[in-house]
Amino acid sequence: MADVKIQSESESSDSHPVVDNQPPPPPPPPQQPAKEEENQPKTSPTPPPHWMRYPPTVIIPHQMMYAPPPFPPYHQYPNHHHLHHQSRGNKHQNAFNGENKTIWVGDLHHWMDEAYLNSSFASGDEREIVSVKVIRNKNNGLSEGYGFVEFESHDVADKVLREFNGTTMPNTDQPFRLNWASFSTGEKRLENNGPDLSIFVGDLSPDVSDNLLHETFSEKYPSVKAAKVVLDANTGRSKGYGFVRFGDENERTKAMTEMNGVKCSSRAMRIGPATPRKTNGYQQQGGYMPNGTLTRPEGDIMNTTIFVGGLDSSVTDEDLKQPFNEFGEIVSVKIPVGKGCGFVQFVNRPNAEEALEKLNGTVIGKQTVRLSWGRNPANKQPRDKYGNQWVDPYYGGQFYNGYGYMVPQPDPRMYPAAPYYPMYGGHQQQVS
């Protein structure tokens, strides 16, 4: 409407008679555009872009990539340093009697550090937080996307978990992804003198939580110590299986038969044995992560080679390379003749991790493949005096032309009756 009004005024001024003795009318004054702007409808100023609310590190990510700041390995708060030492003696006990005080925080942006987590969870009394730790890559210092926050008591941690889980993180539009940490921050897995009385529970519906799984078994078996639903590292959602630990072997044996086919939420559970894997005469040291993965030794952090098993003979190097290409730059692809397997080596470790997670159990060629970590050609194993190659201290493996592969771990999605878990082992069962 404003444009129409301006145009009509212009036409009206042109229709006025012009006197011959007078000079032509002067050109429009320079203020004319301002006059037109006055006739335009007023609009509110454009708000600043959303990303401006983020810390400066988000605006200059490349600087962080090439010159990461020196992050502290562990963040503790001096005003209750004494409390941390007073409670150290009870950490192991608390982790197994329901008094866990540490929560896992996932889906962290790379700029979210210990100070960010502390300010996010600290209420009026900062002394409720004992320690904060963001897990970082040991080579470049960048965040791995998750961390741990330890509180003074289980009640405080439980309150934070219930109140914050699913709410929006400060300065983002992303919700908090929280869960109980299986063990206190920085602690190794507790070694039990007796056998590990755990069972595998499969076919869980997506809504089954640790608490629901625990209640389902503890109502009938009082010796149940803990229950864990395995979560996807990227989405934080259930992978559809979990584990229940018992304190009594007889109750564990009964549960294997009595609970098989019993419904938990909306689905019937499938029960199987879960046996802790031991190698070289000692129990593997490590911690359960709430996302369902096992903390691994630092020696393989640079490994970028993936072993691909179950290849049919018609698959070529190019066929194998194609599905992996979308995850990042590839160094090489090799398929040993007549072995039914192959090796894909990436440039970057994160690309290899994503490919392993996404492509395991998919079809390449005509068969479903199984993926596991291989070994870079540069990291050949030393040989003993008999010519045998030593394998990784916690993975058995075989080698071919400098490449190696860990003993593949069947995916529960591929073998419905095979109870496997990163910390547990089992015997593969035949499926029709």
UniProtKB/Swiss-Prot annotation:
Span list, region Disordered: 1-55, 271-293
Boundaries of every RRM domain copy: 101-183, 197-276, 304-376
Keyword RNA-binding among record annotations: yes
GO molecular function: mRNA binding; poly(A) binding
Superkingdom of source: Eukaryota
Compositional bias segments (type: Pro residues): 22-32
Gene3D superfamilies according to UniProt: 3.30.70.330
Keyword entries, A-Z: mRNA processing, Nucleus, Repeat, RNA-binding
Pfam families: RRM_1
Compositional bias (Polar residues): 277-286
Keyword RNA-binding found: yes
Tissue and organ distribution: Expressed in leaves, stems, flowers, and seedlings.
SUPFAM superfamilies named among the record's database cross-references: RNA-binding domain, RBD (SSF54928)
Protein localization: Nucleus; Cytoplasmic granule
Gene Ontology CC: cytoplasmic stress granule; nucleus
Gene Ontology BP annotations: cellular response to heat; mRNA processing
Entry similarity comment: Belongs to the polyadenylate-binding RBP47 family.
Function: Heterogeneous nuclear ribonucleoprotein (hnRNP)-protein binding the poly(A) tail of mRNA and probably involved in some steps of pre-mRNA maturation.
Subunit structure: Interacts with the poly(A) tail of mRNA in nucleus.
Protein name: Polyadenylate-binding protein RBP47C
The gene coding this protein: RBP47C
